[in-house]
């Protein structure tokens, strides 16, 4: 089964200068890691830009717990060695059977998610929608096809939360396709 996990603003805000538009949001990250632990994926697929933007400690947490696949159309820095990941240069209409038969989690970025949705590979998703008192600025938005697909699908609320001053809130939903 292939499950996506990602956070997005209410208007598709997804990234800002290689980071999250809302900055660090511990309460949502706790819900994310809790759900990732429950899923206990055999495989993680992640875009190169998303992987490289992760803090070192988060990258280290991914290594060894799951087989790591990085979607990259260019070489990664030399310190990211092939012994810790398998590169994916293209997402097509079919995927290796083991990715579908085992628990596989897709973490983003926006382009990888679009490729996976366009080819019908995503079977479910844990989507955290982030609400902010301030307008969220973004230079990367999740494609409207994904937003529409999520809007029209069955959604079950899994977690809700807010930061200490309530300036950020989230709703994490399981979306089934």
UniProtKB/Swiss-Prot annotation:
The alphabetical list of record keywords is: DNA replication, NADP, Oxidoreductase, Viral DNA replication
Q: Which GO terms describe its biological process?
A: DNA replication; viral DNA genome replication
InterPro entries (alphabetical): DHFR-like_dom_sf
Induction details:
Expressed in the early phase of the viral replicative cycle.
Q: Which GO terms describe its molecular function?
A: dihydrofolate reductase activity
Keyword NADP appears in the UniProt entry: yes
The reactions it catalyses are: (6S)-5,6,7,8-tetrahydrofolate + NADP(+) = 7,8-dihydrofolate + NADPH + H(+)
Q: Which residues form the signal peptide?
A: none
Q: What is its EC number?
A: 1.5.1.3
| Source taxon at top rank | Viruses
Q: Does the keyword Oxidoreductase apply?
A: yes
> What does this protein do, in the record's words?
Provides the tetrahydrofolates necessary for the synthesis of nucleotides and amino acids. Bacteriophage T5 induces high levels of dihydrofolate reductase in the host cell, probably for the viral replication.
Instruction: Indicate what this protein is called per its UniProt record.
Output: Dihydrofolate reductase
| Record organism | Escherichia phage T5 (Enterobacteria phage T5)
């Amino acid at each position: 089964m292939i499950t996506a996990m990602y956070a997005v603003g209410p208007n598709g805000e997804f990234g800002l200068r290689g980071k999250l538009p809302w900055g660090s949001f511990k309460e949502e990250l706790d819900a994310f890691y809790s759900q990732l632990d429950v899923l206990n994926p055999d495989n993680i697929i992640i875009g190169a830009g998303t992987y490289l933007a992760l803090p070192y400690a988060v990258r280290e947490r991914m290594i060894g717990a799951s087989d790591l696949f990085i979607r990259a159309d260019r070489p990664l820095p030399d310190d990211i060695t092939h012994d810790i990941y398998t590169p994916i240069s293209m997402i097509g209409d079919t995927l290796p059977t083991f990715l579908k038969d085992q628990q596989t989690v897709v973490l983003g970025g926006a382009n990888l998610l679009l490729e996976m949705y366009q080819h019908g590979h995503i079977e479910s998703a844990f989507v955290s929608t982030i609400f902010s008192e301030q307008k969220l600025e973004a230079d990367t938005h999740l494609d409207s096809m994904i937003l529409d697909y999520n809007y029209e699908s069955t959604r079950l609320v899994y977690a809700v939360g807010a930061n200490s001053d309530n300036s950020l809130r989230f709703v994490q939903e399981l979306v089934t396709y």
